[in-house]
Amino acid sequence: REIVKTKATATGTTLTGGEQIVEGVANETTINDGGIQTVSANGEAVKTTINEGGTLTVNDNGKATDIIQNSGAALQTSTANGI
């Protein structure tokens, strides 16, 4: 489990069966089978690729841009802002 705190940036992370909670910025993340990336309020995911079995969840006031959602991948939002 990785937590990207406010004002912090994580770049080039690959999630396979792990979880990343984004309160800051996550760039160029790849989410594979069993991986979960959760973007919290005021967090931002940029250039994320979601592969089969992976999940990207964007909570209220979170932001996700330049997302690639491949077949079998899940993109869940509680808000339409920033998608």
Predicted regions, residues:
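The right-handed parallel beta-helix/beta-solenoid scaffold, focusing on the short coil/turn
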Residues: 1-2, 6-19, 24-29, 35-37, ...
